[in-house]
Amino acid sequence: MSKKLFIQTLGCAMNVRDSEHMIAELEAKEGYTLTDDPKEADLILINTCSVREKPERKLFSEIGQFSKEKKEEAKIGVCGCTASHLGSEILKKAPSVSFVLGARNVSKISRVIHQEKAVEVATDYDDSSYVFATGSRNDYKAMVNISIGCDKKCAYCIVPHTRGQEISVPSDLILGEARRLASAGVKEILLLGQNVNHYGRRFSSAHPKISFTELLRELSQVEGIERLRFTSPHPLHMDDEFLEEFASNPKICKSIHMPLQSGSTRILSLMRRGYSQEWFINRVERLKALAPETTIGTDIIVGFPGESEEDFLGTMEVLERVRFETLYSFVYSPRPHTEAASWENLVDEEVASERLHRLQARHKEILEELNQKEVGAIHSVLWEHQRRDEGWCEGRTDTGKMVRMKGGEEFLGRITPVRIKEAYRAFLIGEPL
């Protein structure tokens, strides 16, 4: 009987890809098969996020719950950014944990599972960081890491501490992985990096210098890959050359995530973001002039230390002007190893929560308005999933919108045109042409 693996993944797309990496390693090298029931698992992995405090606090209650439910001989491993941050503290607080594996060490999973109380949390570079996973949870889409770590020093962000110095993956390895994925039937690749468009600034050893824009051009030449996406770019590095390539390259999906964080130039300066409200708006206007169909998503933090009502209204102003399609928004959470952690001018919790509610409520209205405008429009959709119980196929447009259509397995993996006939906040309903 094969060994069973259960994995819980929290946080960003980087964590999702790290989990895919560990699953593929354990399936190929250790004979594990995936289960969605922790009670039958021989190995339970919790791949953690530490961007905010709440998920970190919740980790230990989850460990306690898994410890009660698991088979007596089953092991629990804590992986990811909280593992990098807390290290051996996890073993002290949760004796039922067998090992701790940091975000930069996921390639060591096959070795660590055989060690009792191992702690692997180094954030320095080693060649194993470039190992690509051999599996994906989707037959038609795949994620590829093109850089590891982050060199930015945003005042609120713990990621440079948990994921280490930024290193670019050599382009020949990325292109080789893209060709392998294409040969396996993958149609769409999502390129991953903490500051993905900062790619090419540093390699581990002697490699040809290549920029992110040049990498996009080369990847678009890979036969079989029909769509390219990437996350998350930094607004500061969205130069005109990049924007022109984004707009003119037909394989680059016209959907982009531009983390704003705040619409106040004063708060952006305190955050150490390196740009102003004016710069951000300028980049959006330039992008829309080149590719008006582009949809834009963002991240926003409300209640950053010192944020006034006027500062918050600056954020609301940008929301109105840009009309973001997707919004990931949170109340500021102080994190250790960050500049802002020691600041005392915190915003009252009730005030911050009320601002978050206003922001999210207005965004919901904007999203409904944007989606209603899609009725009657024609889009090309890559069909990714089938909801057999409901008879629907699901996929995404080039602009990143979720579409449902009545249909069977014959659509899966194909890109077909549809006309949008109904619109809801979370998805659109299409009909084939």
Curated annotation (Swiss-Prot):
It holds the Pfam family UPF0004. GO terms for cellular component: cytosol. [4Fe-4S] cluster 1 binds at residues 12, 49, 81. Keywords: 4Fe-4S, Cytoplasm, Iron, Iron-sulfur, Metal-binding, S-adenosyl-L-methionine, Transferase, tRNA processing. It catalyses: N(6)-dimethylallyladenosine(37) in tRNA + (sulfur carrier)-SH + AH2 + 2 S-adenosyl-L-methionine = 2-methylsulfanyl-N(6)-dimethylallyladenosine(37) in tRNA + (sulfur carrier)-H + 5'-deoxyadenosine + L-methionine + A + S-adenosyl-L-homocysteine + 2 H(+). It is an enzyme of class 2 (transferase). HAMAP family: tRNA_metthiotr_MiaB. Belongs to the methylthiotransferase family. MiaB subfamily. This is tRNA-2-methylthio-N(6)-dimethylallyladenosine synthase. It comes from Wolinella succinogenes (strain ATCC 29543 / DSM 1740 / CCUG 13145 / JCM 31913 / LMG 7466 / NCTC 11488 / FDC 602W) (Vibrio succinogenes).
